[in-house]
Amino acid sequence: MTDRTSVSATDRILIIDFGSQVTQLIARRVRESGVYSEIQPFNTVTAASIAAFAPKGVILSGGPASVTAADTPRAPIELFTMGLPVLGICYGQQTMVAQLGGRVEAPDHREFGRAFVEVTAGCALFDGVWTPGERDQVWMSHGDRVDAIPEGFSVVAVSEGAPYAAIADEARHFYGVQFHPEVVHTPKGAALLRNFTHGICGCGGDWTMAAFKDQAIARVREQVGSGRVICGLSGGVDSSVVAALIHEAIGEQLVCVLVDHGMMRQGETEQVVRVFRDRFNITLVHRDASELFLGKLDGVVDPEAKRKIIGATFIDVFDEEARKVGGADFLAQGTLYPDVIESVSFTGGPSVTIKSHHNVGGLPERMKMALVEPLRELFKDEVRDLGRELGLPDEMVGRHPFPGPGLAIRIPGQPLTREKLDILRRADAIYLEEIRNAGLYDVIWQAFAVLLPVRTVGVMGDARSYDFALALRAVTSTDGMTADYYPFDHTFLGRVANRIINEVKGVNRVVYDITSKPPGTIEWE
């Protein structure tokens, strides 16, 4: 949870999270309409905390629990007497109904996936979007449903599986929907949310990235004062935006350290040095530690072992370089909003680690520095917008996500060598060049090549070859949580494969990965 006074926005919406997998989408949709929103877990929200946050309205998210069971999550009962507009979504609708005297049941018939609602009456939530008698598509995902509504409410939409698909208490500005307006599968959902934030709550929609930039610069200056900040640059979007923002705030008080572990993409290190040292005139220490990293990784095949070795070695090198420049009072990190809110467990138990994340989490304690995290209220797409506001080049802020361990986890099932890294680096560059030439780079969430631990027989010229097979991966996504493979046409794939085989010595076979997430992950390791 972020500090409640961290963003100086007059108009703000509080989202109380009951554990839905798509709560972040609610926040994104609200912010897309120019209104700052913040997610707070149900078990931390009180009447006092709501008053301190001073929202213009409150949204109750969905969740996996059943209102009909004992000891399941509830909103603070005082919320409903504070005079604030409230919108309950799915579980949020159900708990509002139950807490206000209505009834929720667990019927035999459930609704999951696409459904259609029939609008039975008008209300402020539907203004300009739906009219009585209209039928439209929504996305449902519920087992329980409202069986009786509290006094003051009326039904405004129904569906086959939900007789109270949407309800309204216009006098108190309470609204509930059984469907999910935040997902793209509810085509008019964003318009409904905008009606709530702008029309019902009266938000002005003036939260912009330009305004955020000014506020963030002021906060950095206030926090740092005359202190010194050190920032680890990786070439990725997050660290680049952090460095540019802090430099605009405090100038020469910032020192950046670029630790080159030898596993960056082609030309990436040179671009980072050029942009930050030459264009922004930032003090930048560039350490080529590739020999050290590759030595530590010699013979290592296990992906988790790779990540841990790279993380630990990075900390050692970063610490060494920081001491050389005289140390610092603060460490800048590119923590994003999903990193903050994903740490909340709604079951009280640990979450399963699918892959450990490479970060500099061990540095603050070891180096006795306070953290500066100016991006901790932003989603990834907002970070890109902020980067553009700060004047970073599009080829940097629009860059596809790249893992901290770099190309090390794109050479699976085999020990790393410079030769393999060079083969992968050249093949990856050709692939991305062709994607850009086809005008597809900004359409695709992430694309990369993977050097497989397989050698295959081929014929090149009149001679037998026995070289590596290479996999190509490209996915579309909105947030990286789920993803689908990009459907390239065969002509494009043939052109890429032909170039790689002809231009990259050591590869004689190219395949395309058509696995979605889930069941696969985007990266191979």
Curated annotation (Swiss-Prot):
PROSITE patterns, A to Z: GATASE_TYPE_1, GMPS_ATP_PPASE
Q: What are the record keywords, sorted?
A: ATP-binding, Glutamine amidotransferase, GMP biosynthesis, Ligase, Nucleotide-binding, Purine biosynthesis
Q: Where does ATP bind?
A: 234-240
Give the pathway annotation: Purine metabolism; GMP biosynthesis; GMP from XMP (L-Gln route): step 1/1
Catalytic residues at 90, 180, 182
InterPro entries in the record? Class_I_gatase-like (IPR029062), GATASE (IPR017926), GMP_synth_C (IPR001674), GMP_synth_GATase (IPR004739), GMP_synthase (IPR022955), GMPS_ATP_PPase_dom (IPR025777), NAD/GMP_synthase (IPR022310), Rossmann-like_a/b/a_fold (IPR014729)
| Annotated function | Catalyzes the synthesis of GMP from XMP.
Q: What is this protein called?
A: GMP synthase [glutamine-hydrolyzing]
